[in-house]
Structure formats: structure tokens, C-alpha cells
């Protein structure tokens, strides 16, 4: 044996060359390991496939992904189990939906339960739950004279939408569904709770008559002042009054411009409510919904004052016109919610119980009589409460003029699109926004601006 043959035998080259043709290299196991290691890792760099490149590899991957998706949808079990099925029967006479055995979290904020344990839903609540798939809509038909013999007729979504009897009901449903999808708690004013809470004390007929007499006497006492009042532009006025500065002129001019005095505190709010008289010739816009912010302590029977109140306006309805000034005044007069401009009450939920009335009595007394737990303040103690930010006088005045006092939400529907506009009651008449020079008693170098603020 030569030296070359001995070297090849030692290295094993002769056997490997012979087996190379018979055995093929198998990379499948290695590919599985690599695929398993990288199946959760996404490429962080490099170009991504965001458009077709015409290759067979990409077409195969896309076909495989589609087949997997459609196969999952096709082979999935459809329908609902009998245990979780909630049937809602539409009662045309009451124009409400009845759920014999209501269960689910929606019962915390929707519907009313009667003494038989049945939950009754308003039309907009019924349609909203049908859209979500929470309830299955049925129409109960009485067969024969026996009331207990019913035949269930399943309704489609088109049938449910056909239950609306007017465009106003459909508009209110659009607003209701939009607010519910945003997470708010929405209750229609047509369906008041069992115990109604109001910011205003109950007004008896005797006190109402006395307040009307007070208004007449007050207007009669102001008559001599109006008779002997000299207009500003009359020459006789400057013989009786002397003006030595520009602020005095502005002050006098502001008294000659008519404006509506806006209530700023609790007493002014209640005084305006008691003394105000609604004009019967003015259209009374409906306050459609009371809205609460999402909270776990909400109770349907005693919800308390709402956080917002909503008025619905359909721009496409030829029978509706945008509210006029008098109609806005009527809406502001009927508002009853948590007025956010009352700083003395903007502490926690329990503070409002001392200033509200439930079923004609103070809320504290009502809760003690019915053994209802009071509203708990926010956890964290006084040390964790967020301190109110203070602003300079002129900045605070601008913020107050911008935000206003009483306000409501005007929901505008335009071609099925719902928009929300906040309409606020501002007070430009009693806010002096002109420049007032600094006093002479200060330092000589004091040339800072001093704004007079009455808000």
C-alpha cells in the first residue's frame, strides 16, 4: 500500500465519498430549530413587505395566511349557548322592550326592574343592546285568548330600526349610542329615576306667589329711577356729573349698555330659578339626556345630579331651526346639573349632598331616612388632593369669560354625523375689562398693569 492510500484510509475520505451519493443531506430538523427559535422575533431592521413584488414566495405566503384566516372563521362555532342567551321581547303597546330574566353588567345603568323581576328597556336602550349583540330581539305575539301562550318571532336589525316612529327618536338614538360607546352613563329625561335629585329646593305655590309679588314691587320701586334718569348723551347729564378719568367714563358707559346678569353663586342661581318666569310663546327645547361620567358607584334609583345635560338638534330637519337667543335663555333657565363653576362645591362627591334635594327633602336627610350610604370622598386624603392652580387677575378673568358659567351640550346631527358643541352662559356685562392705572400711593417706578376684575 502506498503512502497516499494509507493517508486516505486514515482520514476516512474513501468511505465518505462512497456514501455521499447514497445519502442526501437533511436540513429539515435544522430548519425546525431555526424556525422555532425565531417564530416570536420580528425583524426590527430592513425593508418590510408593504406592496406586491411579483414573486412566487410572497404569493404563497399571502395565500397561506388567507387560507388560515378564512379557515378559522369558517370552522368556528357560531351562535350563542342557551345559558347565555338573553331574549328581549318588544311590547308595542308600551313601546318598550321586556327582558324576563335580565342578567349582565348593562343592568347597572340601563332599564328598570319591576316587582316581578322583569327589566323594561326604552327604545333607544333596546336598539343599542341589539346592535352590540347583548340581547336577541323578539316580538311576542299572543295566540288566542290565553295571555300565557306566546309565539316567539325573531326580529332582524332592520326590523328593530323600523320601530322608530319619528326622526326625533332616531336622532336621540344616534346621540345616545355615540355617548354610550364613549363610556358615559346616559339616561333619558323621559325615563326619570325612582328618586329625582335637584339642585334647587322645592318651591311651593305660596312661595311662588310671594316671589311674583316681590318681582312686581321691585320693578315698581325702580320706576322713579328710570323717570328721573338723564341719558348720557344729554347736555344736562354733564352738568350733574363730573368725570376726571377714563375709567369713570367706562364705568358710566357700562351702565347704559343692557345685558343679562348671570348668576355666579348658589344664592343667585336659586334666586333666578325662583323669580324667573318662562315665556309661553318661546319654544321649549327638550333636554334629551342626563349624562354622568363613568363611575362604579352609580346607582339607577338615586343617581344624583348629572355631570352634563344634552340637547339634540338635527341640522337636516326642515322643521327645526337653530335655537334663538330667547330659546337659549329658556334652556339655561331649566338646567339642573352639577354646576362646575361653583368652586365651593368642587371638592368631592359628598359635598354635593349638602346642597341638593332628593324627592323634595335635603339629600342628607333622605339618605339617612332610607338608610343609604353617603357618597364616599376620593381616597388619598386631603394631602393628596390636587391643589387648584392660581392665575393672575387678568388671566383668570379671560379664562372665566371663555369657560362661562352655566352650560349644556348641544348635539348637532349633520347627515348622520354627530358633533358636540358646548354652549356656555358668559358674563361680559359685569366684567370690567378696561385698563385701570395704578394708584398714586405706590412707588414711582410701578408701571405694571392692574386690571379690575369682577367675576
Curated annotation (Swiss-Prot):
Residue span of region Disordered: 366-390, 434-455
Skewed-composition ranges (Polar residues): 434-447
GO MF annotation terms: tRNA-intron endonuclease activity
Keywords: tRNA processing
Coiled-coil intervals: none
InterPro entries: tRNA_splic_suSen54, tRNA_splic_suSen54_N
Top-rank taxon, per record: Eukaryota
GO cellular component: mitochondrial outer membrane; tRNA-intron endonuclease complex
Keyword rRNA processing: no
GO biological process, any: tRNA-type intron splice site recognition and cleavage
Function summary: Non-catalytic subunit of the tRNA-splicing endonuclease complex, a complex responsible for identification and cleavage of the splice sites in pre-tRNA. It cleaves pre-tRNA at the 5' and 3' splice sites to release the intron. The products are an intron and two tRNA half-molecules bearing 2',3' cyclic phosphate and 5'-OH termini. There are no conserved sequences at the splice sites, but the intron is invariably located at the same site in the gene, placing the splice sites an invariant distance from the constant structural features of the tRNA body.
Homology family: Belongs to the SEN54 family.
Record-linked PANTHER family: TRNA-SPLICING ENDONUCLEASE SUBUNIT SEN54 (PTHR21027:SF1)
Subunit structure, interactors included: tRNA splicing endonuclease is a heterotetramer composed of SEN2, SEN15, SEN34 and SEN54. Interacts directly with SEN2.
Protein name per the record: tRNA-splicing endonuclease subunit SEN54
Provenance organism: Eremothecium gossypii (strain ATCC 10895 / CBS 109.51 / FGSC 9923 / NRRL Y-1056)
Taxonomic lineage from the root: Eukaryota, Fungi, Dikarya, Ascomycota, Saccharomycotina
UniProt gene name: SEN54
